[in-house]
């Protein structure tokens, strides 16, 4: 049995944040608030969502992009994180898996995901 105060707090956190509907295979553009000393700035991170896990306030997702020199960069974000300013879905991917960890082994065109037809 969960504490009713914790449940009320989690529901308030979820209702405050406007999160778009996305799943694994979608290309996302994230605006992340970064604090360096006294200054804060927004850094964009664009990549493919390769996994979503958890539920409620503790739900997280993994975004993978190919950085400089072809090096893959993966970051894990809590969906309801205060540091996430904005989540924008750029493309909907047509995939048949909920976890796309096999993309870690793919390079170039083999790592492409087909776009979902409307």
From Swiss-Prot:
Keywords, ordered alphabetically: Ribonucleoprotein, Ribosomal protein
Any one annotated GO CC term: cytosolic large ribosomal subunit
GO terms for MF: structural constituent of ribosome
GO biological process: translation
Family membership noted in the UniProt record: Belongs to the bacterial ribosomal protein bL19 family.
NCBIfam families to which the protein is assigned, alphabetical: rplS_bact (TIGR01024)
Name of this chain's protein: Large ribosomal subunit protein bL19
Organism: Campylobacter hominis (strain ATCC BAA-381 / DSM 21671 / CCUG 45161 / LMG 19568 / NCTC 13146 / CH001A)
């Amino acid at each position: 049995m969960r504490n009713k105060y914790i449940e009320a707090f989690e529901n308030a956190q979820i209702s405050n944040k406007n999160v778009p509907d996305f799943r694994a295979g979608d290309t996302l553009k994230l605006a992340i608030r970064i604090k360096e000393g006294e200054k804060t700035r927004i850094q964009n991170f664009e990549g493919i969502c390769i996994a979503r896990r958890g539920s409620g306030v503790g739900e997280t997702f993994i975004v993978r992009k190919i950085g400089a020199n072809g090096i893959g960069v993966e970051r894990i974000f809590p969906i309801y994180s205060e540091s996430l300013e904005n989540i924008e879905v750029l493309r909907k991917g047509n995939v048949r898996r909920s976890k796309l960890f096999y993309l870690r082994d793919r390079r170039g065109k083999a790592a492409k995901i087909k776009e979902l037809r409307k």
